[in-house]
Design a protein with these regions (language model features):
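Conserved small/polar residues in nucleotide/adenosyl-binding loops
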Residues: 176-182
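Active-site-adjacent beta->alpha loops and helix N-cap segments on the catalytic face
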Residues: 65-69, 84-91, 115-116, 137-150, ...
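Active-site beta->alpha loop and helix N-cap motifs at the rims of alpha/beta catalytic domains
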Residues: 76-134
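Catalytic beta/alpha-barrel core
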Residues: 131-142, 156-165
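N-terminal amphipathic alpha-helix/helix-capping segment at the start of soluble metabolic enzymes
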Residues: 2-28
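Glycine-rich, proline-tolerant flexible connector loops at the mouths of alpha/beta enzymes
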Residues: 57-84
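Active-site mouth loops of central-metabolism enzymes
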Residues: 30-39, 105-117, 159-165
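Conserved, mostly hydrophobic/aromatic
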Residues: 29, 59, 125, 173
Length: 186
């Protein structure tokens, strides 16, 4: 049986189909961009790819990271002190576009995206090769509108669900977006 690549299949879905076909689990590490500095982030991304990461979740530091635990908050604080900004992270990914061949998912909050403007942020992220976005504070009610914009740039919107998320809400989320559980218990 031959699988024909669907040209509209996202980089993330394509990666998961490839892993599924090989009966493999995904290795998807998270790192905070800019910790300890933006130059080291470049080295870390390439080393993670070299060592077998299938996808990478790259955090953009934010001054009010409510959805993050203490370790990621500490890392974000260090990254901000090193001068890391959203635009520097996107420029870093743009500079690695020819070297980094695995899907990169940005983890960022909604406020920095609004600062850029939805369309502008999506355009810049797309040009930098971003495959997906996780926006933990994006209200589900805003997700549909944002999803329409983001999909025109071939970027997946990934919504998070918690073990406490009501089942009906999980169904709503899962019918329209990629979802990731926020706990090992799910």
């Amino acid at each position: 049986m031959q699988i024909i690549r669907n040209e509209t299949l996202s980089k993330i879905n394509e990666k998961f189909l490839e892993l599924n076909k090989s009966n493999k689990l995904a290795l998807m590490p998270f790192i905070m961009a800019g910790d300890p500095n933006i130059e080291k982030t470049s080295e870390i991304l390439l080393k993670l790819q070299e060592k077998g990461a299938d996808l990478i979740e790259l955090g953009i530091p934010y001054s009010d990271p409510l959805a993050d635990g203490p370790i990621i908050q500490f890392s974000a604080s260090k990254a901000l002190k090193s001068g890391t900004t959203s635009i520097k992270v996107i420029q870093l990914l743009e500079s690695l576009k020819d070297k980094l061949h695995i899907p990169v998912i940005l983890f960022t909050y909604f406020n920095p995206i609004l600062k850029f403007g939805l369309e502008n942020f999506c355009e810049l992220a797309s040009k930098a090769g971003v495959a997906g976005l996780i926006i933990p504070d994006l209200p589900l009610e805003e997700a549909s509108k944002f999803s329409k914009i983001i999909s025109t740039y071939f970027i997946d919107l990934i919504l998070l669900v918690a073990p406490t998320t009501p089942f009906e809400r999980m169904k709503t989320v899962s019918y329209t977006h990629l979802t990731l559980p926020t706990s090992n218990d799910v």
